[in-house]
Amino acid sequence: DVLGSRGLGDVYKRQIIGWGQYWNIIESNHPLFSITGTFTNPGPYGAFLGIALLIQIHFAWHKYIAKQYMSLFMLLIVGLLTGSMFIASFSRAAWVALLIAVSFFFFLFQKKRYRYAGLLLLILFLFSSPFLYQLKKQSADGRLFIWRVCTELIQSKPYTGGGASSFAARYMYAQADFLEKHPNHEYAAKATNNIYAFNEYLRIACEYGLPGILLYVTIWLHGIYCKATYCDRLRKLLLIYLAVFSLFSYTFQVLPLAVLCIVLGAFQNNNSKFTFYAFPMRYLVIMLLLMTIIAWSGTRSSQYEKKEILFTAKQLYTQQNYADAKEYLEKAAYLSPTSEILMDLGNSYFHLQNNAKAEHCFRIACNMVPGRILPQYYLFRFYAITMRNQEAITLGQSILFGDY
C-alpha cells in the first residue's frame, strides 16, 4: 500500500500536466499528439495513468469491504478524473493491459460471482478487439508489419541474438531486406524508419536469442504466478498489467516503467517460500535499482553518442566536406541506420567517386522506405549521371507512375 500511495502521488503530478496539455495551457512534447504528459508520446503516459487506475481500483475495493464510504467516494471522484485522462491519452496498449489486469483482479477472489465478472471482462476484451484495431488501423498494421520483420531478425540469429541494444542497429537493414524480397507487400508503401519493436518479448528475442527470451518470460512468470500467501494482490496485478503492456510497447526503454518492473519483481512477502533473498530486501531492491539505472544510463549515453555522431555528420555533409562526413555517416549507419543516413552516405561516396558503394547505399535506402520518392530520385540521378540510361529510364517511369 505504501508503494501504491507513493506511485499514485507521482502519477497525479503527471496527470495535472496532461490536463494542462488538454486545455492548451502546457505545450505537448510531440508535434502529432496533443497529450503526452511528461513523455514524448502518449504510450508511456497512458501506461502510467493505467497504473494509477489499477491502484485506485485496488484501494477502492478495500474501502468498500471496510465500509469506509467517504474514502470510497473520494477515490471514485479521483478515479473519474484519472479515467478521463486515461481515455484521452488514446493508448490502446494501456487500455488492453488495464482491462486484462482488472479481469484477473476478479479472478483472484474465491467467490464465483466475482470470477464471473472477470470472465465477462475478458469476453468484453475479445469482442472489443476489432474495434480497437479499427480505431487506429494504420498504426496497428504498422506494428504487425514490424513484428513480421522481427521474426526475420530472430530467424537470422535464433540462439545468440544480435547482442545488447542491437535492435536499432539491425532493424532497418532487416526491413530493407524483407521489402526487397517482398516488393508487393501490402505495407511496403507505408513503411517508415523505425527503431522500436513495440513488443518487449520480440525485442529481447532479437537481441538475446531464444535463451534470453526464455529467461525473460521465466522472470515474469516468477513474479506473477505465485500463491496468494506468497505475494500481495496489488503487486501481482501491476505485474500482469506491465506484462500485457509489454506486448504492444517498449516498457524497458522507459526508465520509470523499467524501475517499477524491477521493484515489483523484487518485493515479496516475508513468508515467501523462495529462499534466495538471504539478505535484507531493501539492499536487494537498491542493487536492482542501481543496476537498472546504470543499464539505462548506458543506453542514454549510447543514444547521446548517436545524436552527436549524426549531428557532426550532418554539419560536415552540409559543408560539403564529404571525406570527413563519410566517416561519421558510416558510424551512424552502423549504430542506428535510417533512409536519410543511407542517402547522405551514398551521396558522400558518389562525390568521393566510389560509385559501387554509392549505388549500394541508394538501393538500401530505397528498400528501407519504398513509398518515399527521395531515395528513388537519388538512385535515378545516380543512374543518369553515370550514363546508365536504361536503368534511369526504368526507374524514372516507376517514379512517375508509382503509387506514392
Regions found by a protein language model. Give the residues of each.
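Alpha-solenoid helical repeat scaffolds
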Residues: 310-311, 340-344, 373-381
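Interfacial juxtamembrane loops and adjacent helix segments
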Residues: 22-34, 164-206
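Hydrophobic alpha-helical transmembrane segments in integral membrane proteins
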Residues: 129-145, 286-319
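Alpha-helical transmembrane segments of multi-pass inner-membrane proteins
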Residues: 5, 10-33, 37-112, 116-133, ...
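Short coil turns that delineate tetratricopeptide repeat
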Residues: 336-337, 370, 404
